[in-house]
Curated annotation (Swiss-Prot):
Ranges for domain Sm: 10-70
Species: Clostridium perfringens (strain 13 / Type A)
One cellular component term from this protein's GO annotations in UniProt: cytosol
Keywords: RNA-binding, Stress response
Quaternary context: Homohexamer.
Keyword RNA-binding appears in the UniProt entry: yes
Gene Ontology terms, MF aspect: RNA binding
Protein name as it appears in the record: RNA-binding protein Hfq
Gene designation: hfq
Pfam families reported for this sequence: Hfq
GO biological process: regulation of DNA-templated transcription; regulation of RNA stability; regulation of translation, ncRNA-mediated
Highest taxon, organism lineage: Bacteria
InterPro entries: Hfq (IPR005001), LSM_dom_sf (IPR010920), Sm (IPR047575)
Role this protein plays: RNA chaperone that binds small regulatory RNA (sRNAs) and mRNAs to facilitate mRNA translational regulation in response to envelope stress, environmental stress and changes in metabolite concentrations. Also binds with high specificity to tRNAs.
Similarity comment text for this entry: Belongs to the Hfq family.
Length: 80
């Protein structure tokens, strides 16, 4: 069995990054951060907001809301 099954979180963030879709990140404390996803790993997201970079820890994120729908197909989600 192929162990390269992509998870939805990675696909979502990667498409937001590649397409440079503006996102609003809502933190668990209510703070809103707006910007472009520049990169991410298992624990953090790097957000570019007006030329300033912010490293946001995923455990502090409640919601990521894109400015427009992020399109992906089932082939990205499920590796046959």
């Amino acid at each position: 069995m192929n162990k390269s099954i992509n998870n939805l979180q990675d696909i979502f963030l990667n498409n937001a990054r590649k397409e440079r879709i503006p996102v609003t990140i809502f933190l668990v404390n209510g703070v809103q951060l707006k910007g472009i996803v520049k990169g991410f790993d298992s624990f953090t997201v790097v957000l570019d907001s007006d030329g300033k970079q912010q490293l946001v820890y995923k455990h502090a994120i409640s919601t990521v809301s894109p400015a427009k729908p992020i399109l992906f197909n089932n082939a990205q989600v499920f590796d046959n």
